[in-house]
């Protein structure tokens, strides 16, 4: 995957001086043990680092300032071992600009009935310490994540891991840069939007570059690099010449590889992590990037067609959250409305990411009427089965809104010999009719990101971090 930086999360434990130095030493010892065992569990995608026992407004404020300016720190996990007066947390929490997880847990997972005394009660006050702390977060309208349960349970560790992925995506969002080659498809409404507001709210930079600038990079790719990649791909994918001559198949496939290298170099040299193309503006290119775009998406670059920069940025963002697993640019295309068979066939002209392929992708070359260029090479495959979420973002003028519904992914009932593209069949879990009407009522777009690796809870957490309206259509 296109790499993100190495992140860590800081663990801050709440207490106070009221209980004495011996108790505070026990608090620190227990907190460090929790951190060590969380890291040793191998369930978390990023390391946790014990930072301090928070006892005063001053040291809480100082640690939150450190979190803000340390680019390596993706967020804070707090735990109240004892009672920790929440007035001490006000200033630091107000200043915190990164994701906050309140882990409402206890060092032991049981009550030691035979030995419990008031010393034990003073030390293990998470039950009401968490309530004091949660109140001030609610009072400050912090919208932070809360996970309650025993820290050693695998289910709780999985919840922490999912939140970590969201927090890292949030941090990485402010570095997402989208290059749009040409503008969006003419006269289309839903792919438009306020780029300035997107940069203010999400950190997304969206830049226009002319196709001629890309053509220079594409033409500069060496034949040696293209030939080497072509031979490598023969080992990973099925090459199907079909009705094409061997010469045409090889030339058209190699041209897509040329576009792949050209796009990749263009983006890497300028710091872009997502891109869009537009079939209406391909001057100087032999083909609409198809296989090229699919190869780049497989590496973790965000993409959307027709100049849809919002979906391209969202694709990159959710790929980060999913570690680039089974998370793809998608488009609703055609419907099965037979009773008992209701489904949506999703696809695009060419550009669907092979990370959801249920079979070995085939490299094929076929005509594409749209765009007026040479027959483009593309990956052809059938999508996977399983639970997924279909996500889109739209700009309503006064706000951005994120929306999704849960879907069941299925394979197509039959092959589609006259539709040589990547495709995915799915049905909204609430039923096609209810899902469609909910989506249309909200004005959700036709370009989406479909993911088998993230869920609606993570989308809600992400929206809370951004202060973004999120609708989970049910």
From Swiss-Prot:
GO biological process: L-arabinose catabolic process to xylulose 5-phosphate
Keywords: Arabinose catabolism, Carbohydrate metabolism, Isomerase, Manganese, Metal-binding
Protein's gene: araA
Family: Belongs to the arabinose isomerase family.
Superkingdom of the source species: Bacteria
Binding-site residues, Mn(2+): 306, 331, 348, 447
Pathway(s) where this gene product acts: Carbohydrate degradation; L-arabinose degradation via L-ribulose; D-xylulose 5-phosphate from L-arabinose (bacterial route): step 1/3
Cofactor list: Mn(2+)
Protein name per Swiss-Prot or TrEMBL: L-arabinose isomerase
Entry EC no(s): 5.3.1.4
Pfam families with a match to the protein in the record: AraA_central (PF24856), AraA_N (PF02610), Arabinose_Iso_C (PF11762)
Record GO terms (molecular function): L-arabinose isomerase activity; manganese ion binding
Reaction(s) catalysed (UniProt annotation): beta-L-arabinopyranose = L-ribulose
UniProt entry tagged with the keyword Metal-binding: yes
A GO-annotated cellular component: cytosol
């Amino acid at each position: 995957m296109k790499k993100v930086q190495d992140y860590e999360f800081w663990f801050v434990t709440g207490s106070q001086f009221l209980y004495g130095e011996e108790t505070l030493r026990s608090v620190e010892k227990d907190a460090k043990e929790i951190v060590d065992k969380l890291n040793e569990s191998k369930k978390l995608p990023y390391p946790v680092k014990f930072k301090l026992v928070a006892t005063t407004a001053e040291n809480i404020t100082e640690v939150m300032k450190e979190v803000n300016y340390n680019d390596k720190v993706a967020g804070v996990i707090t735990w109240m071992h004892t009672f920790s007066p929440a007035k001490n947390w006000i200033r630091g929490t107000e200043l915190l600009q990164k994701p906050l997880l309140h882990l409402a847990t206890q060092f032991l997972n049981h009550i030691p009935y035979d030995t419990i005394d008031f010393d034990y009660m003073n030390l293990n006050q998470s039950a009401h310490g968490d309530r004091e702390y949660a109140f001030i977060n609610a009072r400050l309208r912090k919208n932070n994540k809360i996970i309650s349960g025993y820290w050693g349970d695998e289910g709780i560790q999985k919840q922490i891991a999912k939140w970590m992925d969201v927090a890292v995506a949030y941090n990485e969002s402010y570095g997402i840069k989208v290059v749009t080659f040409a503008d969006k498809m003419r006269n289309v409404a839903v792919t438009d939007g306020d780029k300035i507001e997107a940069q203010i709210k999400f950190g997304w930079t969206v830049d226009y570059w002319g196709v001629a600038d890309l053509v220079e990079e594409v033409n500069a790719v060496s034949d040696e690099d293209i030939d080497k990649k072509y031979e490598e791909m023969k080992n990973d994918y099925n090459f199907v010449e079909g009705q094409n001559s061997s010469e045409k198949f090889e030339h058209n496939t190699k041209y897509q590889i040329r576009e792949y290298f050209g796009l990749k170099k263009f983006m890497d040299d300028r710091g872009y992590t997502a891109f869009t193309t537009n079939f209406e503006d391909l001057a100087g290119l032999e083909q609409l990037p198809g296989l090229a775009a699919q190869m780049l998406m497989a590496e973790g670059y965000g993409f959307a067609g027709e100049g849809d920069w919002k979906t391209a940025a969202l694709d990159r963002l959710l790929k980060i959250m999913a570690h680039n697993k089974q998370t793809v640019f998608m488009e609703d295309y055609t419907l099965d409305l037979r009773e008992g068979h209701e489904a949506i066939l999703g696809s695009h002209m060419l550009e669907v990411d092979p990370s959801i392929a249920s079979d070995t992708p085939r490299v094929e070359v076929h005509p594409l009427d749209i765009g007026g260029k040479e027959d483009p090479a593309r990956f052809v495959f059938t999508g996977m089965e399983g639970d997924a979420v279909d996500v889109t973002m739209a700009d309503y003028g006064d706000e951005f809104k994120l929306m999704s519904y849960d879907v069941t992914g299925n394979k197509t009932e039959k092959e589609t010999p006259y539709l040589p593209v990547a495709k995915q069949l799915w049905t909204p879990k609430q039923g096609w009719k209810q899902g469609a009407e909910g989506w249309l009522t909200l004005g959700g777009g036709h370009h989406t990101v479909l993911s088998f690796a993230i869920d609606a809870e993570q989308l809600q957490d992400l929206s809370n971090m951004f202060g973004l309206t999120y609708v989970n259509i049910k």
